[in-house]
């Protein structure tokens, strides 16, 4: 029901063009300093571990005893005065002062187990037998806590090299190197998680739908964030991975629908962002309006940043060769889109920037070779676009509006990804959002398409219902382009579009009906414009 309400709210907001209503939580800025202290002093978590109530093994199959866990009673931070960060976090949520919460401490040598098999759960999940104590700390016996991980696990700590007591003796352990698949899935009250710096993998669905997960550090040796790892972590506010120099891949849906994620720091070395990885992180970028994509990045996959509303400035790095379908769809407040120069050709996918409503000009002259169908459809403020010598194909409706086929395609995609584990509500939600998209899928105000060199080899003509540009758009081409001159009509049109001459860096001549562009874009600026 919660997601349903959010979906409907978004639809009305989209229709009104008022996505600013999705403001960040008031606490986002106020807990930033405390979060830094938490990362620097992970012992804050261990201080809240009280009496041990259960323990066991959680190593991989065949080597279970290589990694161990201990479950502790947790001193409720709402009544502890020396832990301001956890007090702030816990006050946001509806923790009960009369409830007993728990923490899990994991230590050992190497990998912990994965729990992806059907019916398999981590030992701290489900019904757990724990030691029961009286008020004097004396053991009374045991009792079963139903759904301990799902309802009462509040803190977790995965240790690096450490000396720990096990089976009556102290042993040295080298450290745990991963977070197992599904290990903390659906831990609703898991608030703070510390990962040691030797962890290389955060596995599939490791923290899936941990609604209250507010603080987690990114290990320095991290190499992979697997699919759905942080899906639906609604109160996750910071992802600071800039020091994770070994991180290469963030897989599909990894941070999907982290609706309060306000700050994202990605490291140099990252090459791949998977499908829908950060989609629906609706306030991402409001704390810092520039999305800093690392220069090492090569692939931005389908829907990677769809419905992220606050990136005012976006630069596509020089090594990126593919921007997937819907990649930045409905990034409503995007003002400036730039492309770093380089030698690698770049393809922009279907509806990749659809509905990015605050761009007035876009310079695609650096590396852009193919612009797919509806790539910039619905960009209602867009007035001019510039193209370079790499451009080969501009597909139908690239700069106009969605057609019915594309609307159906978008709805079909949303139907498949909105709620992967709850298909019953998908169709309704997808339909609601599709209706909202129709409200902003209007023909753009684009008046100038300026080609720095020879125009695209493939383009949809103005008379075509799937025209690449609005039919009143003026297409400027280089003077002396024999290909164009041969195809130019007697009335001065090309493919049905009005035309003007372009000298490669300034306008040389215009027809009487053409208004001169401002010539202010990079690579086109000259002090003299001849009319």
Explain the meaning of each model-derived region.
Residues 19-35:
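Sec-dependent signal peptide cleavage junction
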Residues 52-60, 503-524:
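Disulfide-bonded cysteine-rich modules in secreted/extracellular proteins
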Residues 180-182, 204-206, 227-229, 252-254, ...:
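Consensus positions within tandem repeat domains that build extended binding/scaffold surfaces
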Residues 11-20:
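Bacterial N-terminal signal peptides
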Residues 530-531:
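Conserved small/polar residues in nucleotide/adenosyl-binding loops
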Residues 104-109, 127-178, 188-201, 211-224, ...:
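Structural signature of tandem-repeat unit edges
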Residues 35-40, 45-50, 57, 467-506:
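Extracellular/surface-exposed low-complexity segments
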Residues 1-5:
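Positively charged n-region of N-terminal signal peptides that target proteins for export
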């Amino acid at each position: 029901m919660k997601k349903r309400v959010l979906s409907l709210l978004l639809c009305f907001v989209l229709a009104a063009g008022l996505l600013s209503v999705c403001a960040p939580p008031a606490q986002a800025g106020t807990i930033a300093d405390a979060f830094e202290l938490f990362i620097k002093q992970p012992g804050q978590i261990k201080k809240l571990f009280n009496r041990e109530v259960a323990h066991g093994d959680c190593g991989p199959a065949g080597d279970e005893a290589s990694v161990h866990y201990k479950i502790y009673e947790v001193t409720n931070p709402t009544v502890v005065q020396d832990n301001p960060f956890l007090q702030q976090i816990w006050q946001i949520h509806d923790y009960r002062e009369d409830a007993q919460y728990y923490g899990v401490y994991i230590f050992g040598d190497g990998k912990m187990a994965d729990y992806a098999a059907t019916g398999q759960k981590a030992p701290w999940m489900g019904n757990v037998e724990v030691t029961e104590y009286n008020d004097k700390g004396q053991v009374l016996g045991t009792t079963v806590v139903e759904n301990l991980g799902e309802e009462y696990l509040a803190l977790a700590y995965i240790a690096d090299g450490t000396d720990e007591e096990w089976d009556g003796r102290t042993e040295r352990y080298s450290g745990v190197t991963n977070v197992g698949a599904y290990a903390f899935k659906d831990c609703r009250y898991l608030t703070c998680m510390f990962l040691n710096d030797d962890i290389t993998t955060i596995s599939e669905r490791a923290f899936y739908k941990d609604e209250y997960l507010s603080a987690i550090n990114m290990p320095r040796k991290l190499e992979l964030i697997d699919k759905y790892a942080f899906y639906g972590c609604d109160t996750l506010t910071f992802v600071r991975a800039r020091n994770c120099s070994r991180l290469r891949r963030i897989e599909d849906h990894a941070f999907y629908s982290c609706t309060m994620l306000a700050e994202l720091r990605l490291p140099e070395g990252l090459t791949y962002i998977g499908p829908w990885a950060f989609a629906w992180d609706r306030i991402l970028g409001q704390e810092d309006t520039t999305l800093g994509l690392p220069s090492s990045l090569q692939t931005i996959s389908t829907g990677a940043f769809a419905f992220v509303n606050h990136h005012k400035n976006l630069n596509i790095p020089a090594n990126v060769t593919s921007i997937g379908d819907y990649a930045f769809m409905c990034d409503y407040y995007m003002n400036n889109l730039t492309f770093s120069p380089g030698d690698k050709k770049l393809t922009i996918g279907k509806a990749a920037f659809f509905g990015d409503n605050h761009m007035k000009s876009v310079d695609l002259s650096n590396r852009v070779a193919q612009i797919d169908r509806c790539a910039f459809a619905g960009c209602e403020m867009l007035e001019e676009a510039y193209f370079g010598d790499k451009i080969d194909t501009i597909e139908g409706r690239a700069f106009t509006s969605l057609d019915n086929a594309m609307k159906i395609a978008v709805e079909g995609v949303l139907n498949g990804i909105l709620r992967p584990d709850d298909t019953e509500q998908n169709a309704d939600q997808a339909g609601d959002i599709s209706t909202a998209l129709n409200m902003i899928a209007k023909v753009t105000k684009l008046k100038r398409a300026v080609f720095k060199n020879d125009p695209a080899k493939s383009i949809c003509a103005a008379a075509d219902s799937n025209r690449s540009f609005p039919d009143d758009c003026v297409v400027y081409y280089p003077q002396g382009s024999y290909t164009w001159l041969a195809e130019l009509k007697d009335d001065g049109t090309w493919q049905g579009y009005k035309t003007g001459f372009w000298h490669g860096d300034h306008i040389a001549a215009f027809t009487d009906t053409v208004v001169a562009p401002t010539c202010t874009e990079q690579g086109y600026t000259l002090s003299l414009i001849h009319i």
